[in-house]
Amino acid sequence: MTSLLDSRVSTRCSQSSSATSGAEMCAWKQDSSRRRFIQLTMGAAAGLVTGGLEVATPRPALAQSKLSPDAALQELMAGNRRFAAGHSTACEKDLATLRKATEEKQEPFSAVLACADSRVPVELVFDQSIGQVFVARIAGNIATSEIIASLEYGVAALGTQVIVVLGHRNCGAVKATIEGKGEPGQISALYPHIRPAVDQAGPNLDAAIKANAKIQAALLRQASTVISGAVKESKLKVVAGYYDIASGSVTLLE
């Protein structure tokens, strides 16, 4: 079940070669860990802000059980600010170690319902690494019964504390719904899910995209007793967001 959902995000991280011996590398990692701990105790883990930009600093692994829904959302938004500013840190982590740590289990602190658009690489957009984001993707970021079931699994079985429904600039699914053109195959099956947003916002594409994200977020809260129950118990936050593919920035809509 832990592989119920494949994020379909291809993260390419270049790794530089090193001639350092195994013993020297181990010592370096231990020393680096001590330095990070000292930085954390001094309050440096949140990062430095210089000239309005968040400077990339090493971050510790997230302790899911210690995060509140608000803190989980703040972590995602802080990651997006790093990404938009060109200071991403997720790819600096030891990916081999992360793969090993998540081999038998996953404990993502967040979930994102995103469009299938290739220009919206969710983990990169929020500067998160392996095992931190439970991602459901479908054209138009719509809350179908299958998507709701997947997100319920994230909440009930994995303990995610925040769900972000992420619309994005120039969404083709919303544009196609506005135009109402006949499409081959089952593409037009998306339209009924997006039509309420178009009816609400009119032909303005950007307005319809934002309305759609908010409507789908509301649907998650209303259609799922698992999700609504977690929200009522203050264990979960469900919000809508808008990703500008030009700037790289995410704006919360609620």
Locations of regions flagged by a protein language model:
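Catalytic core of membrane glycerolipid acyltransferases/transacylases, capturing the structured
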Residues: 119-136
